[in-house]
Amino acid sequence: MFLVRRIFKVKKGTARQAADIITQIGKMYEQAGLRTSSRVYISGSTVPGPSDTVYMDWIEESLKSAYRKDNPTPAKEDELFGILEDQYQEETSVEFYEIYSV
């Protein structure tokens, strides 16, 4: 099993608003049956850590290409990512971890 963590660096002071959109994105993938439930969390406001940063993580049984032919696109994917990218996101990256114990 793998933990996948996506990191979003967002515009100053917009972490909570961006986290709302990112939460919707996670639920969209979960409802489409494409992903397990995700957690969304922030750092840098009331806790130490990089400022204006939102994280989303979830667990995958195996790592697969997001561009594979059998990977459907959820209905609101373009809309939600469009809002995120236009209004909040400055950059994003993805980290992968192999789960050792649960």
Which residues does each PLM region occupy?
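General helical secondary-structure elements
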Residues: M1-F2, R35
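Active-site-flanking beta-strand signature of metal-NTP-handling nucleotidyl enzymes
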Residues: F2-F8, Y55-D57
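Short, surface-exposed ligand-recognition loops at beta-strand->loop->(often short) alpha-helix junctions
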Residues: V10-D20
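Residues that cap or initiate secondary-structure elements
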Residues: K12-T14, S62-K64, Y100
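An amphipathic, aromatic/His-enriched active-site/gating alpha helix that lines ligand/cofactor pockets
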Residues: Q24-R39, P50, W58-E95
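Short, solvent-exposed loop/turn elements at beta->coil junctions and helix N-caps
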Residues: Y41-T46
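Short, charge-rich, low-complexity interaction segments located
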Residues: V47-T53
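Short, low-order "capping/linker" segments at domain edges
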Residues: F96-V102
